[in-house]
Amino acid sequence: MGSLKKRSVNLAGHATSLALEPEFWAALDRIAKQDAVSIAALIQRIDVGRGERPLASACRVYALQRAGG
């Protein structure tokens, strides 16, 4: 996997920066397109359901779960 790429997203009215490998960003972009939502809306959905898990980890797990099923 490549080096981390940072993107800024707005979550619950707060700007936050999220660093993921390009492959995970590509997977999340595909998922957002499939679900007809913006990448910000998808990440907000992941954020709401992540519990205690760090957001970057939750995004990676979500992408892997969606890829597998």
Language model segments and positions:
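Glycine-rich, flexible loop/turn motifs
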Residues: 5-7, 42, 51
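Aromatic side chains
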Residues: 14, 24-25, 62
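Alpha-helix N-cap/helix-initiation sites
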Residues: 17, 39, 52-56
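Short, well-ordered coil↔helix boundary/capping segments
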Residues: 18-22, 33, 53
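Surface-exposed, Lys/Arg-rich phosphate-binding patches that contact polyanionic backbones
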Residues: 23-41, 45-48
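C-terminal structural segments of small proteins and small subunits
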Residues: 48-69
